Curated annotation (Swiss-Prot):
InterPro entries: Cation/H_exchanger_TM (IPR006153), FAD-bd_PCMH-like_sf (IPR036318), FAD-bd_PCMH_sub2 (IPR016169), Na+/solute_symporter_sf (IPR038770), RCK_C (IPR006037), RCK_C_sf (IPR036721), Transptr-assoc_dom (IPR005170). NCBIfam families: PRK05326.1-1, PRK05326.1-2, PRK05326.1-3. It is found in: Cell inner membrane. It comes from Alkalimonas amylolytica. One of its GO terms (cellular component) is plasma membrane. Residues 402-484 form the RCK C-terminal domain. Coiled coil: none annotated. One of its GO terms (molecular function) is flavin adenine dinucleotide binding. Belongs to the monovalent cation:proton antiporter 1 (CPA1) transporter (TC 2.A.36) family. This is K(+)/H(+) antiporter NhaP. The lineage of its organism: Bacteria, Pseudomonadati, Pseudomonadota, Gammaproteobacteria, Alkalimonas. Signal peptide: none annotated. Keywords: Antiport, Cell inner membrane, Cell membrane, Ion transport, Membrane, Potassium, Potassium transport, Transmembrane, Transmembrane helix, Transport. It is a multi-pass membrane protein. Its main location: membrane.
C-alpha cells in the first residue's frame, strides 16, 4: 500500500512540476515539450528522482494513446480554409517528402555510423516524420500567427505524414528481422493504409456528428464520448491495416468543423486533455531514456541531425513543393520547422519491440536528434518567422466567450465580452454608434462589478466589459468592430497592412489616380484582386504582399471562396 501511495505522490509531483515549469518555459522562450522531456530525464534512473522505467511495451501503449488524443485535438482545430490552401502541398510533403527525408538521412546515417544501408534507412524512416504534437504545441505556446499558407501546410503535413513513416519503419523492421521483403508491395501497403485511414476517418467523423445530434446526453459526456470514439477509431483502423493516426486526425477535422453546440464544449475539454497527453508522453519518454547511453553515440547523432536539418529536410521541401510555386521565404521556413518530437522516439520503439539488432542504437540516436530539433528549431521559430516576414497580426477577438450550450438552436449562440482598453474604438461612445451584424444584441456593460442595462444606453468607459449576444459565426465581424488591439502583439494591423484599406475590385488605373504610380504594361485595367492572385498562382492567403512601384499591397481579407476582398496599402520601404 505504501508503494502505491508513493507512486501516486510521484506522479502528482511530476505533473505539478511540469505545469509550473511552463511558466519558466514561456519566460525564457524554451519549447514546452523540451521542458517536459528534461523533467522526465531528471526524474529517471540516472537523474535526481532515480525512477527506473524500461518497459517499451508500456511506453508504446501510452505514447500511442497520447498521440491519438493530440491528433484528434489538432484535427478539430483545423479550419476548412486551411485544406483549401494547403492540402495538396501538405500531401506531397507527407509522401514524397517523407521518402526523400528517409533516403537522404538514412544513407548519411549508414555512412556516419558504419551501418548496413538497410539499418541506415530504418533510422532514416524513424526520423522522417515531423511531429504533430511538436508543431501544434509550438504554434499555440508561441502565440504567433504565421501566414496561413505556411502554417496550414506544416500542420496538415504533421498530422498526415505518420502513415508513410510508420509504413517505412514497419517494412524495414520486418526486413531486418527477416520476416518480410523489400519490394514494390511497400507502395501497395502505403496506399492501403492511406485509403483505409481516410475512409474510416471520414465515416467516423460523420457518425460522431450524427450521434451528437441524436443522443440526449448531458453536455458533460460528449468530450468523454469523443475520447472513447477516437481511441476506438484508431484501434479499429489499425486492426484493418489502415493508418489509425490519419483516421483520428480526419475524424477530428469533421467533428471540429460541424455546426454543433457540443463542439465548443468538446474543444474546451480536449485542450486540457491534449496538454495532459503531451505532459504524460514526454515525461514517460524522458524516464525511458538512459542519459549515459546517449553519450555513446552523441557525436554521430549530432552529425545526423545536421544532415537532417540542413540537407534532407530542405531537399524534401524543395522537391515536394515544385508544382505549387511557393515563395522562397515560405519554403525556407517550412524547411526550418520540420520539427521532430515524440513520433520519432515512439517509432524507435518498433526495432526494440521486434528484437532487431542494435535496437538501443535507434532509440538513443532518435532521442538526441529530437532534443537537437526542439532546442535549435523549436526555440527559433518566432525570430525566424519575423526575419522572413511571415508573421501576420493576430485576428481580433473577444476577451471572454460563453457559449449557450443548452439552448436548442440550429446555430451556436454565444455571449461574448469585450474589455475596453486605452486603444479601444468604443471609448466614450454608445452601442448605436457602431455598425454590427443585425443579429447581435447588446446586453449591457459590467462597470465596477455593476451591470448597466442596455436600455439605459450607457457611454462606454475604460475597463468596461461590454456584453453582446450573437451567433458564433458573427463573432469575427463583431470583433473587427469592437475588439481592442492586444497589448502582447508583436505588430499592429496598421504596421503590417498599412493605414488604408481598399476594395480589391478597384483597378490599377483607379489606384494610379490617387497615388501616381508607374503601372505594368497592359495591366492598367486589372483589379487589385487579380493582380495579386496571379502573382501567387491563385493560392492567396492573408498577409501576402506584392510590391507595385512605390507601394506595397497586402492581402487583408478573403471572402468565403478564398478570393481577395480587402487590400491594405502602404509605402514601400525601398
Amino acid at each position: 500500500m505504501e508503494a502505491i501511495n508513493l507512486t501516486i505522490l510521484v506522479i502528482g509531483v511530476l505533473f505539478l512540476i511540469s505545469i509550473v515549469a511552463t511558466l519558466i518555459s514561456s519566460r525564457i522562450g524554451a519549447p514546452i515539450l523540451l521542458v517536459f522531456l528534461i523533467i522526465g530525464m531528471l526524474a529517471g534512473e540516472q537523474g535526481l528522482g532515480g525512477i527506473t522505467f524500461n518497459n517499451p511495451q508500456v511506453a508504446f501503449l501510452i505514447g500511442s494513446i497520447a498521440l491519438v488524443i493530440i491528433l484528434f485535438d489538432g484535427g478539430m482545430r483545423t479550419h476548412p480554409e486551411r485544406f483549401r490552401v494547403a492540402l495538396a502541398p501538405a500531401a506531397m510533403l507527407a509522401t514524397l517528402g517523407v521518402v526523400v527525408t528517409c533516403t537522404v538521412t538514412g544513407l548519411a546515417a549508414a555512412w556516419i555510423l558504419g551501418l548496413h544501408w538497410l539499418q541506415g534507412l530504418l533510422l532514416g524512416a524513424i526520423l522522417s516524420s515531423t511531429d504533430a504534437a511538436a508543431v501544434f504545441s509550438i504554434f499555440q505556446s508561441r502565440g504567433i500567427r504565421i501566414k496561413d499558407r505556411v502554417a496550414s501546410t506544416l500542420e496538415i503535413e504533421s498530422g498526415s505524414n505518420d502513415p508513410m513513416a510508420v509504413m517505412l519503419t514497419i517494412t524495414l523492421v520486418g526486413v531486418l528481422a527477416e520476416y518480410t521483403a523489400l519490394d514494390w508491395s511497400v507502395l501497395i501497403v502505403f496506399l492501403k493504409q492511406a485509403i483505409i485511414g481516410g475512409a474510416v476517418g471520414y465515416g467516423a467523423g460523420r457518425l460522431f456528428v450524427f450521434l451528437c445530434r441524436k443522443l440526449p446526453l448531458s453536455f458533460a459526456f460528449f468530450p468523454l464520448m469523443a475520447v472513447a470514439c477516437c481511441i476506438s477509431v484508431y484501434a479499429v483502423t489499425t486492426q484493418f491495416e489502415g493508418s489509425g493516426f490519419l483516421a483520428v486526425y480526419l475524424m477530428g477535422y469533421f467533428v471540429g468543423n460541424a455546426r454543433l453546440p457540443q463542439v465548443l464544449y468538446i474543444l474546451r475539454v480536449h485542450d486540457g486533455l491534449a496538454w495532459l497527453s503531451q505532459i504524460v508522453m514526454f515525461l514517460m519518454l524522458g524516464l525511458l531514456v538512459v542519459p549515459s547511453q546517449l553519450l555513446d553515440h552523441l557525436l554521430p547523432a549530432l552529425a545526423i541531425a545536421g544532415v537532417l536539418i540542413f540537407i534532407a529536410r530542405p531537399l524534401a521541401v524543395l522537391l515536394s513543393l515544385i508544382p505549387f510555386h511557393f515563395p522562397a521565404k515560405d519554403q525556407l521556413f517550412i524547411s526550418w520547422v520540420g520539427l521532430r518530437g515524440a513520433v520519432p522516439i515512439i517509432l524507435a520503439l518498433f526495432p526494440w519491440l521486434a528484437g532487431v539488432p542494435d535496437e538501443h542504437l535507434y532509440f538513443n540516436v532518435a532521442f538526441v536528434i529530437v532534443i537537437v530539433s526542439l532546442v535549435f528549431q523549436g526555440w527559433s521559430i518566432s525570430p525566424v518567422a519575423r526575419w522572413l516576414k511571415l508573421e501576420v497580426p493576430k485576428e481580433s477577438g473577444p476577451d471572454q466567450t460563453m457559449p449557450l450550450d443548452a439552448i436548442a438552436s440550429n446555430e451556436v449562440i454565444e455571449v461574448v465580452s469585450f474589455t475596453l482598453k486605452g486603444d479601444s474604438p468604443m471609448l466614450d461612445k454608445q452601442w448605436q454608434d457602431f455598425t454590427v451584424p443585425h443579429s447581435a444584441e447588446f446586453l449591457g456593460v459590467i462597470r465596477d462589478g455593476e451591470w448597466l442595462l442596455s436600455r439605459d444606453n450607457p457611454v462606454f468607459k475604460l475597463k468596461d466589459s461590454v456584453l453582446v449576444l450573437c451567433k458564433m459565426a458573427d463573432v469575427p465581424d463583431i470583433s473587427t468592430v469592437l475588439a481592442s488591439a492586444a497589448s502582447s502583439r508583436t505588430m499592429t494591423a496598421s504596421d503590417f497592412f498599412g493605414d488604408f484599406v481598399l476594395n480589391a475590385q478597384i483597378t490599377l488605373d483607379e489606384l494610379d489616380a490617387f497615388y501616381s504610380i508607374t503601372l505594368p504594361e497592359h495591366e492598367s485595367h486589372v483589379t487589385l484582386a487579380d493582380y495579386i492572385t496571379e502573382r501567387f498562382h491563385r493560392r492567396v492567403v492573408v498577409g501576402d504582399q506584392v510590391k507595385l512601384d512605390a507601394l506595397v499591397l497586402t492581402v487583408r481579407q478573403l471572402d468565403d471562396h478564398g478570393n481577395v476582398k480587402l487590400v491594405g496599402i502602404k509605402p514601400s520601404d525601398s
